[in-house]
Amino acid sequence: MSDYIVVKCGGSMLNQLNDVFFDCIKKLQQKYKVVIVHGGGPEIDAKLKDCNINVEKRDGLRITPKEVMDVVQMVLCGSTNKKLVMNLQKHNLLAVGCSGCDGNLLQVQPVSEEIGYVGEVSYVETALLKGLINMGYIPVIAPIGVNGNEIYNINADNAAAGIAATLGAKELIFITDVDGILHEGNLVKETDESEIATFIETGVITGGMIPKVQAALASLKMGVQKISIVNGTKDFTEVTGECIGTTVTKGVSIA
């Protein structure tokens, strides 16, 4: 198991990040090599509205014709990425922002013609990430990828999972606005694939938590060994630097 940690921060969380989050990143960086992947859904939706372009999604994926792809690229690779980089550096965390098209970092396979320029990660060029980390920087990745000479939108969860799996990361951390999976008001500290399926069937997991755990399960299938779902507005690291939240693994069940 490597000493890499991949942190995935959804677009809806970016404006909620506080000093506690950046302190947690500092603690993680003391023990591990950290890579951050971010989304940008709310900002993309707002910019599309400004441009009078309809927002359409299918099965959780943004339908991305060429005119939408131009806006997605502008937002993710521009304002969203640079705001997060500047916030990290404001907290004395040196960061370099880049997208998956830089250095062919994220290569993709198109999902389907019906949803346009949307791809899933097929290859990660880790040399760029490792080089930045070895120079003391935190790579901050916008989920844009390439296929041939075309640029594609990538679901940020898929991008983070692909990077974590290729790096053989110790852990993939999903930053959310809740403490993790709750069962009867109590935090579920550890769970696995079969238990999550039961939780969804019985209504323990509902609403916005469903896509989060589905992303966690998809990450496990891609080869990530451990997933943590944590609250990014609270201290989610212990003194040891281990995550506090819900841990999802392939074969752990609650006693």
From Swiss-Prot:
Q: List the GO biological process terms.
A: arginine biosynthetic process via ornithine; L-arginine biosynthetic process
Give UniProt keywords alphabetically: Amino-acid biosynthesis, Arginine biosynthesis, ATP-binding, Cytoplasm, Kinase, Nucleotide-binding, Transferase
> Pathway it belongs to?
Amino-acid biosynthesis; L-arginine biosynthesis; N(2)-acetyl-L-ornithine from L-glutamate: step 2/4
The EC code for this enzyme is: 2.7.2.8
- What would you give as a GO molecular function for this chain, any one? acetylglutamate kinase activity
- Keyword check for Transferase: yes
Query: EC class of this enzyme?
Result: transferase
Q: What does this protein do?
A: Catalyzes the ATP-dependent phosphorylation of N-acetyl-L-glutamate.
What is the name attached to this protein's record? Answer: Acetylglutamate kinase
Organism from which the protein derives: Bacillus cereus (strain B4264)
- Mind giving the lineage of the organism this protein is from? Bacteria, Bacillati, Bacillota, Bacilli, Bacillales
Gene of origin?
argB
